[in-house]
Amino acid sequence: MTHHFLKKTAGLIRAIEPLRLIRPISPIGRAGLFLMAWCCLMTLTACESEDYETGDDEYSYMRADFVEARSAEAKSLAHAITDDGDSLVFDDHLACSWATTADSTYRALLYYHVDKEGSNHVKGISAKQVLVLRLPAKRTKSTPTDPLAFESAWMSTNGKYVNLGLNVKIGKTGEEDKKQALGVVRDTIVALDDGRREHRLRLLHDQNDVPQNYSSKVYVSIPMDGFDPGDLILIDINTYDGPLTRTFEVTPL
């Protein structure tokens, strides 16, 4: 089981204040599918436990995992499954303003403390929303590729997602309708000689004239359940340093 161990510091998880959501990002619904293909960037607030305190004792250190978190009721997370397949149960439900639908599953970067080694009962500390970008059912009319800053790309351990760590440039505009957006489209499908297919995807980014005063971190996940094991996924990303491509092989779920 792989975890990232982090020390809690003031301001570790902060909101992206100037970015707002046009409508709530759909969770994985009861049917088990993400419903949204194009996501508008929002105030990516990290839900945080109010009674968690900073300091240098053992509770200052926490684990961080990308998860599918389940809401018991609106704005409250009850349990989660990590990308490593570990089941986590929160001692107390984690209040989470962006998890707006009851009995639904959300993608998140979860910070938590384990009660004791070998136990799946944990204290939820905070949950940062991860944007889920699913391929649209049909070609979108607008496919902007405004540049952004690329940090990392990796396949989830369970093979369910390709994940991207990005930095977007943001700034206050004073206009409510100035919202950035991220999305993904598929440009080509190529049949390979060995029977597999190569899917070329393109990351979309609409800056929408939002001022580029400073950077803020955003994580996105692209579900792999629509592809066959062995297929190749190429993702083209337009960055401030020029275009780049990251390649992944789909693994069995």
Predicted regions mapped to residue ranges:
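Flexible glycine-rich surface loops and low-complexity tracts that mediate binding to linear polymers
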Residues: 100-120
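Short helix-loop boundary/capping segments
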Residues: 152-206
